[in-house]
Amino acid sequence: MNPARKKPSLLFSSLLFSSLLFSSLLFSSLLFPSAAQAAGEGNGRGPYVQADLAYAYEHITHDYPEPTGTKKDKISTVSDYFRNIRTHSIHPRVSVGYDFGGWRIAADYARYRKWNNNKYSVNIKELLRNDNANSGGNKHLNIKTRKTEHRENGTFHAASSLGLSAVYDFDTGSRFKPYIGMRVAYGHVRHQVRSVQQETIAVTTYPQNAASSVTTNAPIRKLPHHESRSISSLGFGAVAGVGIDITPKLTLDAGYRYHNWGRLENTRFKTHEASLGVRYRF
């Protein structure tokens, strides 16, 4: 699967998500004006829970050491196989926090979609070429080649992210409350690669006055290679968005968050997320 082929579907999903988000915000602002005003007059303090549906854009970049560097023999499977992954997922997220009436702190948990990729490559190399002639003077050409087939199957899964955020809500005197904040999270990533390779030797004969013929040996299969890694790392990010008070206890939340998961072997994993959710204060 070539990640570049996903661009049309990624664009369509992004536009669809944006349309739904705008419609929800417009609907809420028109439907609940009086209740939102009452919410703005409250002190806004207390514990809360929040549920979001997030659209995540996941991006892996490789960071190769120089050939003469000290890490030249530590090229990771992630770098070799998952270089420049760009994919997306839609996933739920839950948060539990406390609102201090301006500042909020929250712990959140999310689990992402597994990404799969398959690769197939073939290489044909000429090993020998002979011009021969039989006793009758008829010439024929023999060409010996080696065909190498390589198949790879891999998965990459941001299995979980457990984060802690500190957020500040700006009081605009209306139902709309923009916010910004910082986030630190402990992320868990799993990835694996399985590859198989086989070689086939073939001799093609081209007679002078006849059709060519091919003679092949049985394929020689090399032992399959399988590697699986599980990595945990501490990363940092930022959050921003706007809350719309629906009732004194219920708030519609439209947000964005950026998170750098940190260094995974010698790659860097980052996510950009747009989310829509509801926050209920007790």
UniProtKB/Swiss-Prot annotation:
Keywords: Cell outer membrane, Membrane, Signal, Transmembrane, Transmembrane beta strand. Belongs to the opacity porin family. It is found in: Cell outer membrane. Residues 1-38 form the signal peptide. One of its GO terms (cellular component) is cell outer membrane. InterPro entries: OMP/PagP_b-brl, Opacity, Porin_opacity. It comes from the Bacteria. This is Opacity protein opA54. Implicated in a number of adherence functions. OPA proteins are implicated in pathogenesis and are subject to phase variation. One of its GO terms (molecular function) is porin activity. Its main location: membrane. Expression of opacity proteins is regulated by the number of translated repeat elements CTCTT, which code for part of the signal sequence; the protein can only be synthesized when the number of repeats place the start codon in frame with the rest of the protein.
